[in-house]
Amino acid sequence: MQKTSFASKNTTGQMKKADVILGLQWGDEGKGKVVDVLTPRYEVVARFQGGPNAGHTLEFGGEKYILRSIPSGIFQGGKTNIIGNGVVLDAILFRAEAEELAKSGHDLTKQLCISKKAHLILPTHRMLDAAYEAAKGSAKIGTTGKGIGPTYT
């Protein structure tokens, strides 16, 4: 489940407002569309939990992008984008996503901060995910197989 929060500061540098978008269903409620509408109003866009199990499709400047890990505030110049402690990152998917954005001129080094405490999905997590799902037989839950659950445990 992807969760995103926003924050803005007043002229004295104090936090004046923070809004949080939570997915309370099964993770595919259209949070991304709400995030896209709200990001221009905030200085900080942060993902604080979730992983790359779904893609958020966006169109900016006539180009189509699919974001799985990077907050969509990256398209709003001058915004700080944060990947927080509770996020699980797949380094391979993250790198591909970052390279696509870099090709289009989005400088992640100036707009993106990643917590040192964010969790990394390893190949063993994906293998465990598949094994746990297979072991459940007809009681399986329909995991995406991306290793997100085992990374959190």
Residue ranges and their predicted role:
Residues 6-153:
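Non-transmembrane, aqueous-exposed alpha-helical and coiled segments at domain scale
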